[in-house]
C-alpha cells in the first residue's frame, strides 16, 4: 500500500509539516549540440567560447589553445559566424532553426508517448552549448518529480566530440542534485532499422519529385580529426555502416552512394574525403547532377542549411556541376519521430510498462 494519500501529495505516515511529495514521474531529456542566443557579436562569442573551450572538441593544452582562442579566434570568428547564422535565422521566433526543430521534435515525441504512458513520462530537451542548458533542464525535471531520467543525445553516430561531451554535461548536472534521479543514457542508433527506414524514405520522397535522377548520392557526415579514429573513436566505421545500410535498403548498386566529411577546421588532417572538395571532383569527373544528404544530423542546422546548401553547393556548381539537390534532415518527420519514440520506449523498459 502506498504511503502517499492519493491526490494529496502527502505521506500518510509523515509529520504534518512534511513537505508535499510530488508524484513520481519519469523524464526523457533529448539533447542536441547547441545554438547561440542571437547572431550579434557577444551572443556568438559566448556560444563559440563555450563550444571551443570544450576539451572533447579541441583537446589542445590550455596554455597553447586559450590565448589563441581568446585573443585571436574570438576576436574575429563571431563576426563571420554571426553572418552565416543570419542567413538561416528564424526571424519570426528569433532563434536558430535547430532550436525550432528540436522543440518540434520534443512535442511530437511527447504526443507519441502520451497514449502509452499518459502523463507518467514527460519529455523535454536541452542543448550542450547555449540554451536551454542541460543543467537547467535536469533541475526542472527533478523539480517536476522525475525520479528517473532517460538522457537521449540525438546523435545517430557516437563520437567523443558529440555524444560523450553531451553525456559529460548530463552527468555533471546530476552531481548538483541533492537527491539524484536514477539515470540511463541512450546509445547511438546508427544502424537501427527504423532510423535507416526513415532515411531511405526521405531520399525516396525527394527523388520522386525530381525531373532527373542524380548521378550519385553523397552522404555527408560531420568531420573529425583522423587521429580520433586512430585512438579508437568508432564514428568513422559507424558512418560507413549507415551509408551501406541505406544503399542496401534503397536497393541500389555499389558505388551509387558516396561517403564524405564536412565542417573541417584547423590544419590537422581530418577524415577524408572532404565534402567541399569531393563534390567539386564529382563535377569535374562528369557527375553533373548530385544529391547530398546528412545522416549524422538529426535536425537541420548551420552545418546543413548554410554549409551544405551554401558553400558545398557553390563548390559543386563552380566546378561545372549543373543540378545540386539537398535532402533535408529528418527533423520532425513522422517516420523520424516514430523511430526516436521506439528507441525511447525500448530504453524505458523495466522502468515503466
For the regions a protein language model found, what residue spans apply to each?
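Active-site-proximal alpha-helix that buttresses catalytic centers in soluble enzyme cores
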Residues: 2-353
Amino acid at each position: 500500500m502506498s504511503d502517499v494519500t492519493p491526490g494529496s501529495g502527502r505521506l500518510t505516515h509523515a509529520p504534518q509539516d512534511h513537505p508535499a511529495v510530488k508524484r513520481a514521474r519519469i523524464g526523457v531529456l533529448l539533447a542536441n549540440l547547441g545554438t547561440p542566443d542571437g547572431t550579434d557579436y557577444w551572443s556568438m562569442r559566448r556560444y563559440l567560447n563555450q563550444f571551443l573551450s570544450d576539451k572533447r572538441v579541441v583537446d589542445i593544452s590550455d596554455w597553447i589553445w586559450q590565448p589563441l582562442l581568446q585573443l585571436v579566434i574570438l576576436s574575429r570568428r563571431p563576426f563571420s559566424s554571426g553572418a552565416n547564422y543570419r542567413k538561416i535565422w528564424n526571424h519570426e521566433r528569433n532563434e536558430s532553426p535547430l532550436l525550432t526543430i528540436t522543440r518540434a521534435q520534443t512535442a511530437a515525441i511527447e504526443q507519441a508517448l502520451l497514449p502509452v504512458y499518459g502523463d507518467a513520462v514527460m519529455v523535454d530537451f536541452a542543448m550542450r552549448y547555449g540554451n536551454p542548458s542541460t543543467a537547467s533542464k535536469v533541475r526542472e525535471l527533478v523539480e517536476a518529480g522525475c525520479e528517473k531520467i532517460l538522457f537521449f543525445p540525438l546523435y545517430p553516430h557516437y563520437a567523443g566530440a558529440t555524444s560523450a561531451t553531451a553525456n559529460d554535461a548530463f552527468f555533471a548536472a546530476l552531481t548538483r542534485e541533492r537527491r539524484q534521479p536514477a539515470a540511463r543514457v541512450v546509445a547511438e542508433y546508427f544502424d537501427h532499422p527504423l532510423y535507416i527506414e526513415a532515411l531511405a524514405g526521405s531520399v525516396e520522397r525527394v527523388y520522386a519529385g525530381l525531373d532527373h535522377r542524380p548521378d550519385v548520392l553523397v552522404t555527408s557526415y560531420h568531420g573529425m580529426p583522423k587521429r580520433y579514429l586512430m585512438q579508437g573513436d568508432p564514428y568513422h566505421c559507424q558512418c560507413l555502416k549507415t551509408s551501406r545500410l541505406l544503399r542496401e535498403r534503397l536497393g541500389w548498386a555499389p558505388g551509387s552512394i558516396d561517403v564524405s566529411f564536412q565542417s573541417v577546421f584547423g590544419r590537422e588532417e581530418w577524415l577524408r574525403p572532404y565534402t567541399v572538395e569531393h563534390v567539386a571532383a564529382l563535377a569535374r569527373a562528369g557527375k553533373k547532377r548530385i544529391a547530398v544528404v546528412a545522416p549524422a544530423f538529426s535536425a537541420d542546422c548551420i552545418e546543413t542549411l548554410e554549409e551544405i546548401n551554401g558553400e558545398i553547393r557553390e563548390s559543386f556548381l563552380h566546378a561545372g556541376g549543373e543540378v545540386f539537390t539537398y535532402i533535408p534532415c529528418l527533423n520532425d518527420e513522422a517516420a523520424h519521430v516514430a523511430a526516436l519514440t521506439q528507441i525511447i520506449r525500448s530504453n524505458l523498459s523495466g522502468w515503466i510498462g
